[in-house]
Amino acid sequence: TKKSIYEWFNNTKSNYQHKDFYKIYIDFPKNELLNRIHSRAREMIKKGAVLEVKKFNSLKVRNDKTASKAIGITEVNEYLLKKIEIDQVIEKISIKTRQYAKRQSTWARGNMQNWNKKNPIQLKNFLKKF
C-alpha cells in the first residue's frame, strides 16, 4: 500500500462503532518486563540464535534491508567475528530490546490513552469474568 501503519489505521473505515470494543493495553511492571527481556535473550541464544544468524548470513541479504536490522543479528555477527563474547551478545540483545520496549511504552502512553491499562494479573482476573 506504500502507506505507513499510522496512515492506514487513520484512513481505514471500520464496520464497528468504538463502543463495540473494550480496548486493553497490557502493561507489565518494569522489573518483570526487564527480567522477561533478559530471560528471552538467554533463551534465544540457548535455542540456536547463532546458527540461525549463520543461515541468515548465507542468504546474502543486504545490510540495508529491514531483516538485517532485527535485534540480535548485529550482536550475533559481532560474536561470529570474535569481537565479543556470548555473554556480551546476551547483554547487548537485552539492552536493545529494553530500548525497543521503552519506545513502545512511550508510543502507547501517547496513542492509547483511552485504552484500559492492565498488568497481567489484572488482565487474568478480568478475563475470568467472561
What is the predicted role of each segment?
Residues 13-130:
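Catalytic core of IPPT-family isopentenyl/dimethylallyl transferases
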Residues 1-16:
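Inter-lobe coupling linker of SF2 helicases/translocases
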